[in-house]
Amino acid sequence: PAIPAGGEVQVSLKKEYPGVKPWTAETPNLYRVTYSLNGKDSRSVNIGFRTVEIADDGAVLVNGKAVKFKGVNRHESHPDYGRAIPREVMEKDVQIIKAHNINTVRCSHYPNHPYFYDLCDRYGLYVMDEANCEAHGIRNSGMDISRKPSWKKAHVERNMSMVHRSKNHPSIVFWSLGNESGNGPNFVAASEAIRAYDDTRPLHYCEFPHGHKAVDMDSAMYPPVDRVENWGKQKTSRPFFVCEYAHSMGNALGNFKEYMEAFESSPRMVGGAIWDFVDQSLRANPAGNGIYKPAPFKGVTQAYGGMFGDRPNQANFCDNGIILGNRNTTAKTKEVKKVYQYMAFVRKDGSLTVLNKYFHKPLKGYALYLVSLAPGGNHAVERMALPEIAPGKSVTVKLPSAAMQTGSLMVLADARFKLPEDVKELSAKQLEHVADECEAYEWFPATVEKEASVKAPAVLPAVSVRQGDPVVVQGKGFSASFKDGMLSALRYGSQDLILPGCPVALQAYRSPVDNDAWIRGKVEGKMKMQNMKAEYSDVKAAVISPGVARITAQFRTKGSDLSFSGEVAWTVFGNGIINASVRMYPSAKGEELLRLGVTFGIPAAYDQVEYLGLGPWDNYRDRRTSCWKDVFRTSVDDMFFAYSRPQDMGNRMETDWVALSKPKAAPALWVGSASPRAPLEVSVLRYTPKELNNAKSLDRLPEKDKVIVNLDAFQMGLGGSSCGPRPLAKYQTLSEATPLGFVLAPTSALLNLARAGLGVPHSPVIERDGDGMVSLVSSTPGAEMKYSVNKGPEKTYRKPFKLPEGEVRAWAAAGKSGKVPPTSPGERKFPLVKGQGEWKILSASSEEPDTGFAHFAIDGNPDTYWHTSYTNGLPGFPHSIAVDMGTRMKFTGFIYTPRMDKDKGLISQYTFSVSDDGQNWKEVKKGQFTYHYIRKDPAVQRIDFGKPVEARYFKLDARSPVKGGEQSATVAELNIITQ
């Protein structure tokens, strides 16, 4: 028909085309449609055919099949171009996203450049397109524009302009109404407008309450893993999409695997989007070019808020990417690729099961590479062709050798990447490259570890001890000095290996990673762990057997609120082996610690690193899924990672040994765990934790004048969010009696001898839990341990034993070689304790039936809690709860664990009292709890009395709430400090 000027005509065409291939992110089939006006003016557009539906169980179906959306949020940002990203950068972003098994992008928080959607159509990515409705700072306030009628038109128009512009892109499967801008009627109007025009895509908005009819799915930001699991158990037809999770600020992405497992546990948990894809940093060049008060500049840095004199700012809070601003990948990127991968492997009973986790794509033409790991040498490779595996199905194949069935095995699979047929072996570096290229892989540790057996020499070289401070020990080709009982100098041959001023020292502080926000205030502010230093006493040195000397010292730390005491023992052999045993007892149990171990410095020239442990990138107890155990070769500079704000990095879990050398030289120093069954956590960097923490940007780091070696018994997990939940409980590290053993040697042969032939029997630490069960723990697992109770007969330790009160003495039996006496016995006296299981609630001002019983406060489970009444009246503050311990107990403080799932009912002002009859009370402590990080994750409160008290009953009076106006109080756990 004729179209008048300014007019509009809508034309509908219908035609059947047989054999059309549908579009999915896995199979991005596109068709080119060209339309013209009178054959003169023409346009072309790519289209894809696909459907999006919601199933009765809450699953989202693409073309009739349930899909998990493995997503990431993406801002348009580049350090050189700012928000105006060139097309080639957009394409590189999409290539990186696809290469790391991400199938979904949330356009946060505005529609992106049109070309980006073309790329998503072509490469295959699901997209949540989001309207530019962002009023973060004024939502849910008197200025909330989502509730102002004058802003209704803006909300509707911004949403509809997004829909009209991008409606023909098959990649867009969700419309999002905006971000964190309130949940008023203007968003309901926007929802109604979209639905009237396009009802083919589900609607999302994170601010509406769950179940709200204006959107088709529930949503949340930064929930803890257990909450995701609980949402998945709800019986509803509404999908749940976690629009922001795994906040990737700095050294982050802990417990990422557990989030994916939670998504896969329920049909309605359709997935989520990591926050976020790329650091929003800016490139800053030499000093004076915009950087605010810079230190002497030595190169290019990633600038963030505040470095340009801008006030206010959010510092590095926009540097949350799994890749850096310059598009370099990180250990976070590797973890995402591994956890999001579309194949799963299970080794069992000599067979390998391969599961296809794609939703639409069959595994066709895939090759399987089976790599038997032989750390330190080349790894044998065998190929196997996989039969075609349909989506969601699996096949099981027989592993061809006994070594593959029980040994350390790497399984890799891909259809595009092919190893040449003549390649029968891979070096560690080649395996790293293949794993990076392959679509999916899995490492299976050996099911049975073969312990090396090295015969001890019949005669050890002589060793001499020169008394004084320092004590000097000399043997064949080496000398070692011990100042104040700690190794302060070491010379192997002609090489001095301990840097003057950097002796071996105890360490319980790491430069906080961004995700340590939940505990940083406590660690640095209250506990002052960065100031911890040890004082040594009772230093003893002697030759204890032919060719063996021992130096021992008692220590107690000062400068920090949490202190440690214990013993260090150095066993020095005439051949240069030095075996260290450290027993550390904290002044308080159960305090969160970022790390615990030792540190020392070596000359800067020894910057080449070889190690047997998890790698090839850095890993932590909750971010290690993408790693495998091998001998890796790297450098100190390569173990450093250029986060925009320097912080802890470079950690390697399960490290058996690390060797340090100058470039193109043999290793001069070998450092290993004391036992193959007690690997260490190790990092080797140019900087101390304090230096990393003090440098707020890369250009402010000091000169590279040393190498710092950190040997840890443990490090805290990274956690999954700097603005949300702390690390999972299983990845947290708490103060407790801790043994640490390690070995230094000049050669690998002597290191192996030290660990397998000349093992020093390390006497155990002695620990007792709240129920009175005593455990003995040695830094040499498997060692035979002896003990006596109250000076009674000697017993062999086999399992924890009950001790309500008394003295325990524990020691190690003689080692296998018979050449080395055990380290000195440990002794501990324990006051009377009755476990929480024997306690009873004496009284409570009120309780909430079923969900908030008073006895939940002493049940040992922090996931349950006493909640004052709210369904049968709301009494308001003050509240009280009293406990009967069943007998008189001597204690020095109490522990209040707040409710952990949310910041509700938190107690501010309190009074703690004790009684011998349960009626007459004596006030012991009065004060106010301090919360360093309230949002979503209150901190455990540990209150010391200053001097011991003795009583049978105790009572906590809650006098005021943290949040003004709250009426209820909650207590997850109440306990006492007995030592």
Set out the residue ranges of the language-model regions:
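Short, compositionally stereotyped local motifs that mark structural "simplifiers"
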Residues: G757-T864, H879
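Extracellular beta-rich ligand/substrate-recognition surface
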Residues: T329, Y340, R556-L562, G719, ...
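Short glycine/proline/serine/threonine-rich loop/turn segments at secondary-structure transition edges
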Residues: Y17-R32, M404-M410
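Aromatic, loop-rich ligand-recognition surfaces of beta-strand-rich domains
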Residues: N861-K926, D937-Q979
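Carbohydrate-binding surfaces of carbohydrate-active enzymes
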Residues: F263-L487, N579-A580, Y731, T747-N752, ...
